[in-house]
C-alpha cells in the first residue's frame, strides 16, 4: 500500500525547535512511505517540516532534528490518519486480553484466556478482563411465568394512597390538630403531612419509623395499606 495520500499539512514551523545532530540518518518521508517502515524517529527529521533544509543540503547540511515532544505529537496524528484506512484499523495497537468461558458436552466449564485485536467484535459469552470496575448492577423486571406481561406498578414502591390520606386527615381533625401540629409531633415538616393526605406523593412502609410515629400520634395501633 502506498502512502502518497497522506499529505503533510497543518505544520506550524514556529512550534519547532531544530537542532543539529552529528550523525544524520537517511531521509524518510513518512507521508510517502510504507507505514510499517515508519517509526517515531522518522518524525524527528527537520527536513519534513522545513523545505529549505531539504532542498539545500549543501547550504544547511544534514542531521537537523526537532524536539521529541513535537515529533511524538506529529507521530500520533499520522497514526490516527493511517488507522482510518481499511485494513489498518488495528495498526500498531496492543491486543486486548479477554476471558472466554467454554462448556463441553459433559457440562465442564473452562475459562480460556486469549488476546484479540482492538475494536474486534466480542462474542456474547466473552467479557473483557477489566470490565465491571464500576460495580454497576442493572435490574430488569421479568415475570416468573413465561408469556405474562409485567406491570410496572408491581415494581414501584408503595405510596400513601388518597384513601389513606383521607382517613389520616379525618383522624387529625378528630384530634383537633393542624398539619403543622401533627408534623411537630412526628418531627417532620407540615408539607410532608400535606403530601401524605394528598396521596401518591410519599412512600409508605409499615416498618418506617416515621409511619410508626404517625400512627402513634393519631392514636391508632398501625396504619394499614389500602
Swiss-Prot record:
MF-aspect GO terms: DNA binding
Residue ranges of DNA binding: 179-198
Family matches, as InterPro entries: Cro/C1-type_HTH, Lambda_DNA-bd_dom_sf
Keywords: DNA-binding, Transcription, Transcription regulation
Superkingdom of this protein's organism: Viruses
SUPFAM superfamilies reported in the protein's UniProt record: lambda repressor-like DNA-binding domains
Record-annotated HTH cro/C1-type domain positions: 168-226
Keyword Transcription regulation listed: yes
Name the UniProt record assigns to this protein: Uncharacterized HTH-type transcriptional regulator R559
Amino acid at each position: 500500500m502506498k502512502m502518497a495520500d497522506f499529505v503533510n499539512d497543518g505544520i506550524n514551523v514556529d512550534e519547532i525547535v531544530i537542532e543539529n545532530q552529528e550523525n544524520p540518518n537517511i531521509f524518510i518521508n513518512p507521508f510517502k512511505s510504507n507505514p510499517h517502515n515508519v517509526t517515531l524517529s522518522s518524525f524527528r527529521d527537520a527536513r519534513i517540516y522545513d523545505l529549505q533544509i531539504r532542498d539545500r543540503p549543501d547550504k544547511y547540511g544534514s542531521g537537523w532534528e526537532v524536539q521529541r515532544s513535537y515529533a511524538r505529537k506529529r507521530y500520533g496524528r499520522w497514526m490516527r490518519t493511517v488507522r482510518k484506512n481499511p485494513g489498518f484499523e488495528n495498526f500498531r495497537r496492543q491486543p486486548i486480553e479477554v476471558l472466554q468461558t467454554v462448556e463441553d458436552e459433559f457440562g465442564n466449564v473452562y475459562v480460556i484466556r486469549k488476546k484479540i485485536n482492538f475494536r474486534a467484535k466480542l462474542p456474547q459469552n466473552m467479557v473483557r478482563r477489566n470490565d465491571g470496575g464500576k460495580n454497576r448492577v442493572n435490574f430488569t423486571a421479568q415475570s416468573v411465568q413465561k408469556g405474562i406481561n409485567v406491570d410496572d406498578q408491581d415494581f414501584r414502591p408503595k405510596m400513601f394512597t388518597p384513601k389513606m390520606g383521607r382517613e389520616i386527615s379525618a383522624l387529625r381533625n378528630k384530634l383537633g390538630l393542624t398539619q403543622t401540629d401533627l408534623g411537630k409531633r412526628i418531627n417532620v415538616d407540615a408539607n410532608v403531612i400535606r403530601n401524605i393526605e394528598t396521596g401518591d406523593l410519599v412512600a409508605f412502609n409499615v416498618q418506617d419509623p416515621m409511619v410508626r410515629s404517625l400512627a402513634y400520634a393519631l392514636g391508632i395501633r398501625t396504619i394499614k395499606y389500602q
